[in-house]
Amino acid sequence: MSFFNFKAFGRNSKKNKNQPLNVAQPPAMNTIYSSPHSSNSRLSLRNKHHSPKRHSQTSFPAQKSTPQSQQLTSTTPQSQQQEASERSESQQIMFLSEPFVRTALVKGSFKTIVQLPKYVDLGEWIALNVFEFFTNLNQFYGVVAEYVTPDAYPTMNAGPHTDYLWLDANNRQVSLPASQYIDLALTWINNKVNDKNLFPTKNGLPFPQQFSRDVQRIMVQMFRIFAHIYHHHFDKIVHLSLEAHWNSFFSHFISFAKEFKIIDRKEMAPLLPLIESFEKQGKIIYN
């Protein structure tokens, strides 16, 4: 379900590594939603399946502030004063500045695109969109992956007041370099979407009871990667003239999350000023 066909992008690490950021580089891919990237995460994306019809009772429970799972993370708490400070500081951030904050590939909102189509099973619709979001985000991360080095980004964060900690196998919170965190998150998501017990592809197999919970966790991890890229690598996105593609992709992602109430608003705090701007512009509309 790739709704956009537009200019190619990509990176050839051997070619781009030695070129300065102010040198325009030719695109390397036909579409940004059709080809896997060659990032350091080394994920192998599964082939797209046409899932059979099935009936599910998918619903998303209210979000809780408790840790999400052994494989996922928790954030450092933010006080209202810190959040207000971040909002003030964020006014100077590139992705909130003109003209970038208004740049988009798609005019109007994604409301009709994210709504559940008639006669389509909710679980099928959720699964399809989650897989597409993951595939596209995986590609976008490939554009900036070579710049996400442990020396440059020793912690995974989304701005000055939001740090993301990984919960290891012993349920201990550990601070990781952004590159390691993102690779672990993408690998974890990749394993989830390729788990046929969680994302069944055979006719007649229902979605499991934990499907909604795992979808919430997958979407939260993807949001955190969005947040890191916006706060630290938006200049690379602009350098490649991909800000319209990126903003539209994020608007699509958030519209879907809001339509089905998948991500809690508190989790969106690092990008809330941007989301609110998109809402005012009519790019994000929800009930």
UniProtKB/Swiss-Prot annotation:
Cellular component annotations (GO), alphabetically ordered: cellular bud; cellular bud neck; cellular bud tip; cytoplasm; mating projection tip; nucleus; serine/threonine protein kinase complex
Keyword terms, alphabetized: Cell cycle, Cell division, Cytoplasm, Mitosis, Nucleus, Phosphoprotein
Entry keyword Phosphoprotein: yes
InterPro entries according to UniProt: MOB_kinase_act_fam, MOB_kinase_act_sf
Source organism superkingdom: Eukaryota
Biased composition (Low complexity): 34-44, 63-83
Coiled coil location: none
SMART domains with a match to the protein in the record: Mob1_phocein
Stretches for region Disordered: 1-89
Pfam families linked: Mob1_phocein
Phosphothreonine modifications at: T76
Other comments on record: Present with 2250 molecules/cell in log phase SD medium.
Protein name, as recorded: CBK1 kinase activator protein MOB2
Species for this entry: Saccharomyces cerevisiae (strain ATCC 204508 / S288c) (Baker's yeast)
Gene encoding the protein: MOB2
